[in-house]
Amino acid sequence: MFGGDKKLGTESYKGVRDFYPEEQAVQNYIFSVWKKVVESWGYAEYDASILEPLELYKSKTNEEIVNEQLYSFKDKGDREVVLRPEMTPTVARMVAGKFNEIPMPARWYSIPNLFRYEKPQRGRLREHWQLNVDMFGSDSPYADAEVIMLANDIMKKFGAKPDDYEIRINSRALMNALYKKLEIPEDKSKIISRIIDKKDKIPAETFKEALEKEVGNAAEELIAILDSKDGVFEMLASTAPAKYLSEVVDILEKSSIQNLKFTPTLTRGFDYYTGMVFELFDTNSENSRSIFGGGRYDNLINDLFG
């Protein structure tokens, strides 16, 4: 039934925002800086629909997003559809679709709007825009370093100083080597990495209990290694993941980056990461949060599309 005398409210849907001209001007400026920097590094822009099939996210996206935060529905053809919660599976799908036609290494970027049904809070709404920068077809440590240097250039372009933020870096491959050294079963690696990523966000006792539930007595030794300054590198210095990450760090330090910090508790939440992971973290106590984040995902295209 249509019609009636009920007046409509002027508020936007909960968790999203309107952009009046003065606010749109600010967003446009931010986007223009992003574009100027990434294009100076040789990245080409792409885009895709906000609609994707549900199965694209089921296997590799963070379980919390899939189980609790997706905007999903069935269309009139009875297909399960989502509003994209992240862009990486989408760009992986696009590259897989024309893999033999795309010159490698391929440098692509996009500024997508993304949707997650989560509790709206400061700095986190149900719709947000982010800069996605991806390089395909390179196994060089320089590729890992390049993305971090690019993010660092963006911060400088906005006027940030080195002490305004720190660049935290780790490696999922290095952490997997650590789990193997501690004889933690391989099938536990993903859940352990998710728990470790929460270490600085939950009480110490809660963190310990979560680890003990998964790995028993190995939890105490794992915590001691994570808490020591160089414990992970000292234990695994001769391994391939440690040597690779050291090469990435060396490239970054030679590029005059001053605020790099090895952070073994940084693992990032997505299951598709296989190597280096990083975050640019705001050091201002009033805005203590990640600004940029990402990492290497070597197997995503093959895992999803064969």
Where does each model-flagged region fall?
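Short glycine/threonine-rich loop-to-helix capping motif typified by GTGT followed
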Residues: 176-186, 272-278
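Auxiliary tRNA-acceptor-end handling modules of aminoacyl-tRNA synthetases
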Residues: 1-24
